């Protein structure tokens, strides 16, 4: 993947636009997410490991909001179930084009990988096939809050017995002191990764109108309301977490 450093918010902007997954973001996305999301590499690689435990023969593995395909690549590295395929979908043209390039490169380096389709489209309009693994890796937080339950219900309806949804999200906290502490620690993480206070502030202004995090309890209750039987947190680093939801 590209090693271009993220300097998108390094200079003062007269007006900070809403964050969008456009060509500028795609160009620096690997650097951006690694320096912004604590534990991201561990989540992605272990998502592949977890998926291998839930994948069922002759089913689909979905990567919803696939961005550059890091999760898709992890699924293909770890899952060996017969007859499975990966369907990766994103609504950003720039992301989809670059994702296809990266997956073609993966094809040239490895043999016996799962077949994959990369689709440009809206996950809210997706016609789900029978699935054993669905990954929502930092995607649900960009879906309008009033549309989240319906999406999760459709995912639950597509999951076969023994399958799982793996949901990774930034969290907010209902306790003000806890929320303030973990927010400050996240800022410290970004500073330690080379972001200036200006970059942090401008990125926050850009993203706060388009990303709406939920609390862990809100996720749990929504997943249960969508028909999942069990919700198990398996990873948390600061205010970022990943959950396994079982049908």
UniProtKB/Swiss-Prot annotation:
Family membership: Belongs to the class I-like SAM-binding methyltransferase superfamily. Cx-SAM synthase family.
Molecular function via GO: carboxyl- or carbamoyltransferase activity; S-adenosyl-L-methionine binding
Functional summary from the UniProt entry: Catalyzes the conversion of S-adenosyl-L-methionine (SAM) to carboxy-S-adenosyl-L-methionine (Cx-SAM).
Record keywords, A-Z: S-adenosyl-L-methionine, Transferase
Name of the molecule in the record: Carboxy-S-adenosyl-L-methionine synthase
EC number(s) stated in the UniProt entry for this protein: 2.1.3.-
Superkingdom as given in the UniProt entry: Bacteria
Binding locations of S-adenosyl-L-methionine: 40, 65-67, 90-91, 122-123, 137, 204
Catalytic activity of the protein: prephenate + S-adenosyl-L-methionine = carboxy-S-adenosyl-L-methionine + 3-phenylpyruvate + H2O
Cystine residue pairs: none
EC class name: transferase
Subunit structure as annotated in this protein's UniProt entry: Homodimer.
Designated gene of the protein: cmoA
